Amino acid sequence: LVFGGYYSWENIGKLIKSGFSSTGPTAALFVFSVLYFGIMTDAGMFDVIIGKLMLLVKDNVIGVCVMTCIIALIGHLDGGGASTFCIVVPAMLPVYKKMHMRPATLLRIAVISMGVLNLMPWAGPTMRAATVLGIEAGSLWQTILPIQACGIVLALAAAVLNGIIEQKRG
């Protein structure tokens, strides 16, 4: 930009400072959420939740699919896909194998659930959109919260539908 004659060295410094000041709160929120949910995972919080949920469904295929959705929704509260897969897949894949369910169904349900939770204010897509719009991520999230609630209902419905398909498959 400098060598092309668009900006001077002084302007580049101002642009960098402006960029950091506008994205700083977003970055801080993201770092906090990753650290917090990482600590909660290491502390075994999700193991307790998964154990309690699986006691409810036992060998019900539709129930396992719904629990997969709920676990993915809880696991994706941090907005990070990698951590969600580290929670959902190790917990649910043995159950799916034991019940002769397809691993693709596990992934499909998890990804649908994760897509809905990507609207959380600390998730990457919402933070980027808020930064571009020049508003706080929480303010943006409040406007899309009803859409997210509908998305959660649709994710649960998709889990039930996938469970019915798996049940018919045998």
Task: Describe the residue ranges of each PLM region.
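Hydrophobic alpha-helical membrane segments of integral membrane proteins
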Residues: 1, 81-88, 105-109
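Short loop/turn hinge sites at secondary-structure boundaries
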Residues: 4-6, 170
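Short glycine-rich loop/turn motifs that provide flexible caps or phosphate-binding loops at active sites
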Residues: 3-4, 43, 133
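Membrane-embedded alpha-helical segments and adjacent helix-loop junctions characteristic
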Residues: 7-97
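Membrane-core helix-loop-helix motifs of multi-pass transport proteins
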Residues: 94-170
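Proteins with a high burden of low-complexity, intrinsically disordered sequence enriched in S/T/G/P/A and R
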Residues: 2-3, 15-23, 141, 157-161
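Hydrophobic core segments of alpha-helical transmembrane domains in multi-pass membrane transport
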Residues: 1-4, 32-38, 68-75, 147-162
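Small-residue-rich segments of transmembrane alpha-helices in multi-pass membrane proteins
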Residues: 2-4, 27, 65-66, 114-124
